[in-house]
Amino acid sequence: MSFASETKKELTHMDVSDSDAKVELAAFIRMNGAISFSNQLVIMDVQTENAAIARRMYQLLKDLYEVPIELLVRRKMKLKKNNVYIVRLKSGTRGILEDLRILEPPMTFTKSIDRGFVKKRSAKRAYLRGAFLASGSVNNPETSSYHLEIFSVYEEHNEAICALMNQFDLNARTLERKNGFITYLKEAEKITEFLSIIGATSALLHFEDVRIMRDMRNSVNRLVNCETANLNKTINAAVRQIDNIKYIQSTVGLEALPERLREIAALRIANEDVTLKELGEMLTTGQVSKSGINHRLRKLDQIAERLRSGETPAQVGLKISNS
């Protein structure tokens, strides 16, 4: 079962007050409900592929309204042959839709969220919970990117959901998709806040555990990569230094170097694997710091490059013995 499915399953077990149940129902029906007319009856079908969600919608309707409710199961014939669960109302539909602020007399469907319906903080939470159950999704925190979204067919309703989420400072944004609109979150911290808002405590804790472990692994990897890069840089520098010193040795001899450069050159080619700090401690003329050793080695690099470019030892400042 996916992380999103586990989250929704957790939400279907929540106990809520009657007022919050109405708000949750309103969000779900607005997004997943369909109205049809037959023999002067207004029939409402609320559809989902999630059995636990279907049971919750059925139970909430049954607890709130004394009307006959049907729970039907259909099987998809295309693509994934999943079951489709339909909660159907054949009587009292108009009154229920008006009570849920989805329908206004005589028969006008509202396009946004009734502000009075979500005045209380708990009602705001309930509406977002219903919207997420209806058409929400959230990436597994172990995947490469964090993403939570709620899909809506209608732009006005999508904007209302975004505004409702941002009343909780979630930094939600909207985006148009091929068949509708989404309100989405990309920040891990905001996703955990949203899960807390809708009451998905277990999902929140799992998300945070995985996120912390993932961030720790990323930090370790960055540290290892940094240390590896530094090691490679050190090795490459040592190889270059030794090559340059050997070039000086083969062309003019180390004896042509000033004493302070001659000693470090001899130590470097005799101790290829030691660090700059260790080289500094080997000098017979007195210990020299890492920066001091590095400065001398850079001077040797410059001498080698100038000799390679065709300059004479005298031009470089070297004295060649005639003996």
UniProtKB/Swiss-Prot annotation:
Regions recorded as binding DNA: 275-309
Entry keyword Cell division: yes
Top-rank lineage group of the source organism: Bacteria
Entry's Gene Ontology molecular function annotations: DNA binding
InterPro entries assigned: Homing_endonucl (IPR027434), Sporu_reg_WhiA_N_dom (IPR018478), Sporulation_regulator_WhiA (IPR003802), Sporulation_regulator_WhiA_C (IPR023054), WhiA_LAGLIDADG_dom (IPR039518)
Any Pfam family the entry gives: WhiA_N
Keyword Cell division: yes
Record GO biological process: cell division; regulation of sporulation
Keyword field: Cell cycle, Cell division, DNA-binding
SUPFAM superfamilies in UniProt: Homing endonucleases
Chain's role: Involved in cell division and chromosome segregation.
NCBIfam families registered for this protein in UniProt: DNA_bind_WhiA
Family per similarity comment: Belongs to the WhiA family.
Protein name: Probable cell division protein WhiA
Organism: Listeria monocytogenes serotype 4b (strain CLIP80459)
